[in-house]
Amino acid sequence: MNTLTAPLPMATDALSQFGHDAWWVIGLKAVLILVVLLLLTLFNIWFERRVVGRMQHRPGPNVNGPFGLLQSLADALKLIFKEGIIPKAADKAVYLIAPVIAVIPSFITFSVIPFGPEVTIPFTDTRTPLQLTDMPVAVLFVMAIASIGIYGIVLGGWSSGSTYSLLGGLRSSAQMISYEVAMGLALVAVFLYAGSMSTSEIVAAQDNLWYGLILVPSFVIYLIAMVGETNRAPFDLPEAEGELVGGFHTEYSSMTFALFFLAEYINMATVSAVATTLFLGGWHAPFWLDHAWAGANEGYWPLLWFLGKVLFFVFIFIWLRGTLPRLRYDQFMAFGWKRLIPVALVWIVAVATIRSISLDGGVDRRYLLIGIGALAVVFLVLFFIGGAAEEQPTTVPEAAPAGGYPVPPMPAGGPVRGAAVPLTFDRSSPIASSMPQPSAATRSAGEEI
């Protein structure tokens, strides 16, 4: 039977595993998540600098520790002990609390991310899932908490007392609102196939087939939207150095700057973990390895598969930063509203139709192929032909010279802006008589030219 039309196994009742842990087990898992995120952030910073260094034919950090692994830790210690400078025009209370607002939601989102199946805690007989908690609307919880972090960026830009910071904060808010819509629409197809919004149930539903293989448009839309959500290159417009110096953290230094930096890299890990959970089977081993090795999804091995998939998405972030130039702000916003969102809406309708027909008894493959072909044509029209109707930028004509001198701004009632100004004028006027007259040699030279 066709993969797209075959009834997929619905998610199991994985929520029954939660709500039974002892208090010390919950505390232990919370501390471990915090430690893993901090270590993963230090590793990702080192990994990015090494990969970008190789792309630019240089070694990258290679002095502190083996392979330079301790360079990120050294940089963190340096920022901790640096002096914190608060601008005179800043709102001190909001200025200091903004980085905290930005970083806390990035930690909270990992509370519903499944790192692995149920395991036995070493040196005890207690069994617990490698996930802090879960809920029936866990994915919506992740998106809601992640959107709170934008308040820290906007408040940080506003409270700094700098125009550059304020513009960076406003850009970031507009960017996140625009691409969060596309991201949410990309996830609707996953909900339709899994029959649940619980992260653990979505992972369980991908036991035999990953959604990234059958929901390719949703996967691609999510990949683009997650780069825009995290303000990473080529969508790092809120902190464009050539336009806004440093964007919303221009006036930040020391530990407050480190918190913004930490929030950015943890958000990278968050969207990568969500992509792993919803599209690449979560902690499940690659399907070819699962068939060859029966114990691939047992014990603590799933934690390794999960982290490997997360690092794969982190590498995509780094690769995009090292290869693509930054987009213009108008191009970026138009791409989100005029391309991603319409395509996501069309794809949701197609997925809902295919899913409904498949659950009612299947559909002939020929009709399915015809429908997919028509859908592909719509995608092509939206992506390529739609750009021709965009408004062309207008150019302002240069001011025409008069008698060798620039034309000053015309008073009210003068020619309309852009209208041609005659090159000759009445030299007997009072204005012309007060102007210096060119010599005979200058006039003859001008005539020869």
Swiss-Prot record:
Transmembrane stretches, start-end: 23-43, 93-113, 137-157, 176-196, 209-229, 258-280, 300-320, 332-352, 368-388
Pfam families: NADHdh
Disulfide bonds: none
Annotated GO biological process: aerobic respiration
EC numbers: 7.1.1.-
Catalytic reactions on record: a quinone + NADH + 5 H(+)(in) = a quinol + NAD(+) + 4 H(+)(out)
Keyword Nucleotide-binding listed: no
Signal sequence extent: none
Compositional bias ranges of the Polar residues kind: 427-442
Swiss-Prot/TrEMBL keywords: Cell membrane, Membrane, NAD, Quinone, Translocase, Transmembrane, Transmembrane helix, Ubiquinone
Cell compartment(s), UniProt: Cell membrane
Membrane topology: Multi-pass membrane protein
Span list, region Disordered: 427-449
GO MF, any single term: NADH dehydrogenase activity
Enzymatic class: translocase
GO cellular-component term (any): plasma membrane
Assembly behavior: NDH-1 is composed of 14 different subunits. Subunits NuoA, H, J, K, L, M, N constitute the membrane sector of the complex.
Its biological purpose: NDH-1 shuttles electrons from NADH, via FMN and iron-sulfur (Fe-S) centers, to quinones in the respiratory chain. The immediate electron acceptor for the enzyme in this species is believed to be ubiquinone. Couples the redox reaction to proton translocation (for every two electrons transferred, four hydrogen ions are translocated across the cytoplasmic membrane), and thus conserves the redox energy in a proton gradient. This subunit may bind ubiquinone.
Family membership: Belongs to the complex I subunit 1 family.
Protein name: NADH-quinone oxidoreductase subunit H
Gene designation per UniProt: nuoH
